[in-house]
């Protein structure tokens, strides 16, 4: 495996373990040339899934888009990269279990929001504001009230 820091091909695996949901192998590696450590994930290749956009266009499913959106929502929040990676794995697993070769962006957005709600409420509101295209302050207030109602319901 090529080192992302110095480009050397001389790296070794320090630790290998399956992810919590079992869909990937997480490997901790060390470069023999520069000594830096990095993490890689090994996944099986799946049949291509197409994402149906709002305007009807179709494009190949890209888990990196989901991960990047979640990273953006979790920016400056106490959420680790590993937590985001596991959430993305759960989203991909749910989509795979649903068994469709086409999935609407709406479904992906709902799954991302479910995961973010569990991880961090501020990240959830950030993502919701973009995903639901908030244009008014009242829309933010409504989603915050919804979170508060859910939290109060859990405490009872």
Curated annotation (Swiss-Prot):
GO terms for biological process: negative regulation of DNA-templated transcription. Signal peptide: none annotated. PROSITE patterns: ATP_CONE. A zinc finger (unnamed) spans 3-34. GO terms for molecular function: ATP binding; DNA binding; zinc ion binding. Binds 1 zinc ion. Belongs to the NrdR family. Negatively regulates transcription of bacterial ribonucleotide reductase nrd genes and operons by binding to NrdR-boxes. This is Transcriptional repressor NrdR. It comes from Thermotoga petrophila (strain ATCC BAA-488 / DSM 13995 / JCM 10881 / RKU-1).
């Amino acid at each position: 495996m090529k080192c992302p820091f110095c480009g050397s091909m001389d790296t070794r695996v320090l630790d290998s373990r399956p992810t919590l949901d079992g869909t990937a192998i997480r490997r901790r590696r060390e470069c023999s040339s520069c000594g830096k450590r990095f993490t890689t994930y090994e996944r099986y290749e799946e049949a291509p899934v197409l994402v149906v956009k709002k305007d009807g266009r179709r494009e190949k499913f890209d888990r990196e888009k989901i991960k990047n959106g979640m990273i953006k929502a979790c920016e400056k929040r106490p959420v680790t990269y590993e937590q985001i990676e596991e959430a993305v794995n759960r989203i991909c697993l749910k989509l795979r279990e649903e068994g469709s070769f086409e999935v609407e962006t709406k479904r992906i957005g709902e799954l991302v929001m479910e995961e973010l709600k569990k991880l961090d409420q501020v990240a959830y509101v950030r993502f919701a504001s973009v995903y639901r295209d908030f244009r008014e302050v009242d829309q933010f207030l409504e989603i915050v009230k919804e979170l508060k109602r859910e939290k109060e319901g859990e405490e009872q």
